Design a protein with these regions (language model features):
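Structured domain cores in non-transmembrane regions
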Residues: 40-117, 121-125
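Acidic, small-residue rich beta-repeat scaffolds with periodic aromatic anchors
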Residues: 90-167
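N-terminal export/targeting and maturation segments
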Residues: 6-66
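Sec-dependent bacterial lipoprotein signal peptides
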Residues: 1-4
Length: 167
């Protein structure tokens, strides 16, 4: 069996990073989220692999229900669809703020203006919601934004990243 040097690029399994972050909610309370990401997909020769899939999971305060969200790999993008910006909760309902991951994702998700995609968990699944349905109480970015390379490795080493280090 022959294989060219380029045939396997982006097809090999890559490592997974995982860490926890303490998220400061709008009311001053905190919750811990677990984040993990895998690497792979299309990229230029000599460049690191992009984030292929990004997952968060958390238990809402005062509940025992674990909630999970994944920004999955998209073949048309060659990477994950979204970059996470914030995790919020109001009256037991979680919300997410994400941004499309580069121009192809921005186009795929309808060129939102401002360039954010909002999600609300309806008790069974995550649903995209319009900006106007996103609670006005949420005004902050409350998760680590730089999660690749050395900065990602630093997050993993810290165990639980405190909310003070994220702000």
């Amino acid at each position: 069996t022959e294989m060219s040097a380029c045939e396997g690029v982006g097809a090999l399994p890559f490592e997974r990073d995982s860490w926890q972050e303490e998220v400061l909610l709008h009311d001053g309370s905190k919750m811990v989220i677990t984040r993990s990401q895998t690497y792979g997909g299309r990229h230029e020769v000599g460049q690191p692999s992009p984030i292929k899939e990004h997952t968060i999971s958390f238990t809402l305060p005062n509940t025992d229900k674990t909630i999970r969200w994944t920004s999955e790999y998209s073949e048309d993008l060659g990477r994950t669809n979204f970059q996470l910006l914030a995790v919020h909760a109001l009256n037991g309902t979680p919300y997410l703020v994400t941004e499309p991951n580069l121009c192809l994702s921005y186009n795929k998700w309808g060129r939102p203006n401002p360039p954010y995609v909002f999600f609300k968990y309806d008790g069974a699944a995550w649903q995209r919601i319009p900006r106007g349905a996103f609670p006005h109480e949420f005004t902050t970015i409350n998760v680590a934004l730089s999660t690749i390379g050395r900065k990602g490795a630093d997050l993993v080493k810290q165990g639980v990243v405190s909310s003070e280090k994220i702000q």
